[in-house]
């Protein structure tokens, strides 16, 4: 098979991976009263089956086997963004928050937000520390869980997933995990999802209320969600008597609690003594701020220096992730002035309890967790870096490469979001020689290499060398601002301004904050040139004076004229915009009615009973989920209140869902109301099928009566096959109640649109 054909084939299979369904990893995400189950498969088994056919073709054409490097870059390294806590954890924390005093929780949540804002504004030299859970009250613990638990879980899940990719041996060993991080054993929860069932789990926590939460989560809730649960042991302090006993030690959000550098180093020594000498791992994770990265950087330097000072080979150590080297960190923020840090992001779905005590306008369903971390392995030295193993084009990628843990540890890592430009991609990496490199991968480097560069993400390993490279010097990595004495002010002094030549054009020249017009100066220059031979001294000095003083007067006049012109233009624009806005206000209602009558926007009632059969109510799991949001309104003359009991529900095409509205009569007499509904966008209304609802029916409510109104619906499976629905991810279901009015014959007079 020709090489060009192989290249196109591998590109086709690479794009084909987006068409397969995820099936293995379970992730439960609740939205309101409805819990939806998503299935994901991180191994892309279907893509492997297709790649096996391509490998057979390569073998038959006497070419090496398909590159495992390509397999790694295509599927193994891609991280899932659909991370969320289990439903039972969410319900448990939600129940704790609702039982507590709302005022205290909101106060402590605001205090945490203020501390986070203060941390980002303070310089590194200013003292700052987080409050330890040891001194927290019960409402403070709940406020911390509300603010930090989803973010901390997403960060640790991403770190452990990356650790499993880079160091594949960690999943094969017997796991003895020690979680001494801040919170209710979040590191242990993340390890359950990434690694096989560990042999033993220990959690360090002193707070009595937090210990109770840990017991409930890890002994009562977690065993019901796992086929092979592990009951953890809760400890009051670090088990310093069990040195070299744990294969994985996790400390998240703990370094910011240290008051001094001595306390920080003592804590690191204690953690390091608990790590097993036979390849044990220490995971340190902090918030992705300047202070958090600074602590991670100091801990990294301290532990590496500690291992170098000992002659015992059992205490050898090296960085597993994210650094591909054991040298000095090239990002030096303590001696610089830029907020240039090594941090990463992880997308995740917010838990329902995270939306409590949050204004409605600030509620979101997902967010990103910023974190800085380091993973250090004890007792094993870093494998030698094979500097000749570099990949530059498609031919190198198609070669047979054995992707193993020693190889992955020396690969460069992307430390900033790739800049995807037209025709090329700019990727900044931290390389194995402790330098920052900028790789530029253009289209001319190869279609496969360019495609992989376009699909690369922040935090990925990237072994490709760009066609164009620039390396930062090891002595000065960060850019420093110029000294204040050498910077220019807004209006620089005259000696810094360019000179105004005699033979300039009539166009104005912009220098600093001054506009120079040279029309009059040009006319005077001609007169001076004509008479300069008669009175050379006079005209020479007068000419110089005019260049300085006369031109300034001209520039001032020009500035005033330009200011008045800009002022008049601005007024004209404001008047025109005001008239247009006023006219648009009067024309909005008829224009909207005309638009709805022509396009069908506003929803169409689906009365075809043949589309309500059970065959259409089968979820199509191979399609994306659609967010259905709810809204309730009443007419101005109706003394009712109408609101949805849930804000949103995520459903698949063909999946049935049940929602509830609550209607309340706030008046002192009985009222009969009739509801109508609206679907936005209107083109999706034909696929929105309601099996049962309360619209177009008379609803009588007694004085001060409150009732629940159900809505049972599903989205027709043909929604997924319609190309016009391709970009529709959100559907709004809105109900409006009107007061029912009758004529003398008892017929309903209320107009429903």
From Swiss-Prot:
Keywords: Iron, Iron-sulfur, Membrane, Metal-binding, Mitochondrion, Mitochondrion inner membrane, Transit peptide, Transmembrane, Transmembrane helix. HAMAP family: CtaG (MF_00155). It comes from Schizosaccharomyces pombe (strain 972 / ATCC 24843). One of its GO terms (biological process) is mitochondrial translation. The record marks 568-569 as: Cleavage. GO terms for cellular component: mitochondrial inner membrane; mitochondrial matrix. This is Rsm22-cox11 tandem protein 2, mitochondrial. The gene is cox1102. The chain crosses the membrane at residues 571-591. InterPro entries: CtaG/Cox11_dom_sf (IPR023471), Cyt_c_oxidase_assmbl_CtaG (IPR007533), Ribosomal_Rsm22-like (IPR015324). Specific enzymatic cleavages in vivo by mitochondrial processing peptidase (MPP) yield mature proteins including rsm22-2 and cox11-2.
């Amino acid at each position: 098979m020709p090489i060009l054909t192989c290249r196109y084939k591998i590109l086709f299979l690479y794009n084909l991976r987006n068409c397969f369904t995820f099936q293995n990893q379970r992730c439960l995400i609740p939205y309101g009263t409805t819990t939806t189950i998503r299935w994901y498969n991180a191994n892309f088994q279907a893509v492997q089956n297709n790649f096996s056919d391509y490998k057979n073709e390569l073998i038959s054409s006497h070419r090496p086997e398909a590159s495992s490097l390509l397999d790694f870059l295509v599927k193994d390294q891609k991280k899932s963004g659909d991370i969320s806590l289990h439903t039972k954890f969410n319900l448990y924390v939600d129940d704790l928050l609702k039982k507590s005093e709302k005022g205290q929780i909101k106060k402590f949540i605001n205090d945490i937000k203020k501390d986070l804002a203060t941390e980002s504004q303070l310089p590194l030299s200013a003292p700052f520390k987080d409050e330890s859970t040891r001194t927290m009250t019960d409402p403070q613990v709940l406020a911390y869980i509300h603010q930090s638990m989803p973010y901390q879980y997403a960060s640790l899940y991403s770190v452990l997933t990356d650790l499993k990719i880079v160091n594949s041996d960690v999943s094969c060993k017997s796991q003895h995990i020690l979680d001494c991080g801040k919170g209710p054993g979040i590191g242990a929860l993340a390890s359950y999802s990434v690694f096989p069932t560990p042999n033993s789990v220990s959690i360090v926590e002193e707070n009595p209320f937090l210990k109770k939460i840990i017991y409930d989560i890890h002994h009562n809730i977690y065993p019901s969600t796992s086929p092979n649960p592990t009951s953890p042991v809760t400890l009051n302090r670090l088990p310093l008597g069990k040195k070299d006993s744990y294969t994985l030690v996790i400390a998240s959000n703990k370094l910011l609690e240290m008051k001094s550098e001595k306390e920080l180093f003592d804590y690191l020594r204690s953690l390091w003594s608990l790590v097993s000498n036979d390849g044990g791992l220490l995971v340190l994770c902090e918030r992705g701020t300047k202070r958090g990265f600074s602590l991670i950087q100091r801990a990294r330097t301290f532990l590496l220096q500690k291992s170098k000072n000992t002659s015992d080979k059992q205490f050898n150590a090296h960085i597993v992730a994210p650094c591909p080297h054991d040298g000095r960190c090239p990002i030096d923020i303590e001696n610089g002035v830029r907020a240039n840090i090594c941090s990463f992001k992880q997308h995740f779905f917010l838990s329902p309890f995270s939306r409590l005590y949050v204004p409605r306008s600030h509620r979101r369903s997902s967010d990103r967790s910023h974190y800085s971390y380091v993973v250090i392995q004890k007792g094993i030295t870093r494998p030698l870096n094979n500097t000749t193993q570099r990949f530059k084009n498609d031919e190198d990628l198609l070669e047979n490469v054995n992707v193993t843990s020693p190889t992955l540890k020396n690969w460069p890592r992307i430390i900033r979001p790739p800049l995807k430009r037209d025709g090329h991609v700019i990727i900044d990496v931290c390389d194995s020689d402790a330098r920052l490199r900028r790789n530029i991968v253009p289209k001319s480097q190869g279609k496969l290499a360019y495609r992989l560069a376009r699909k690369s993400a922040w935090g990925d390993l990237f072994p490709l060398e760009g066609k164009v490279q620039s390396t930062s010097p090891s002595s000065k990595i960060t850019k420093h601002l110029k000294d204040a004495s050498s910077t220019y002010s807004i209006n620089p002094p005259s000696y810094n301004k360019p000179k105004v030549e005699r033979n300039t054009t009539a166009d104005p020249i912009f220098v600093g904050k001054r506009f120079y017009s040279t029309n009059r100066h040009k006319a005077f220059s001609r007169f001076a040139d004509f008479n300069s031979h008669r009175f050379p001294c006079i005209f020479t000095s007068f000419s110089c004076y005019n260049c300085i003083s006369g031109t300034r007067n001209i520039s001032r006049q020009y500035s005033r004229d330009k200011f008045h012109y800009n002022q008049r233009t601005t007024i004209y624009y404001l008047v025109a915009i005001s008239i247009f806005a006023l006219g648009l206000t009067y024309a909005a209602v008829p224009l909207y009615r005309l638009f709805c009558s022509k396009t069908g926007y506003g929803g169409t009632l689906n009365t075809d009973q043949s589309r309500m059969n059970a065959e259409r109510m089968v979820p199509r799991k191979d399609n994306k989920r659609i967010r259905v949001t709810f809204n309730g309104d009443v007419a101005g003359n109706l003394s009712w209140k109408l609101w949805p009991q849930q804000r949103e529900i995520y459903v698949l095409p063909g999946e049935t869902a049940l929602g509830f509205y609550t209607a309340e009569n706030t008046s002192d007499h009985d009222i009969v109301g009739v509801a109508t509904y609206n679907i936005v966008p209107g083109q999706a209304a034909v696929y929105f099928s309601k099996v049962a609802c309360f619209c177009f029916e008379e609803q009588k409510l007694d004085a001060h009566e409150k009732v629940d109104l159900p809505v049972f619906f599903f989205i027709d499976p043909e929604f997924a096959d319609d190309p016009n629905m391709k970009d529709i991810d959100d559907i709004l279901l809105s109900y409006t109640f009107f007061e029912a009015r009758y004529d003398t014959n008892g017929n309903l007079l209320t107009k429903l649109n």
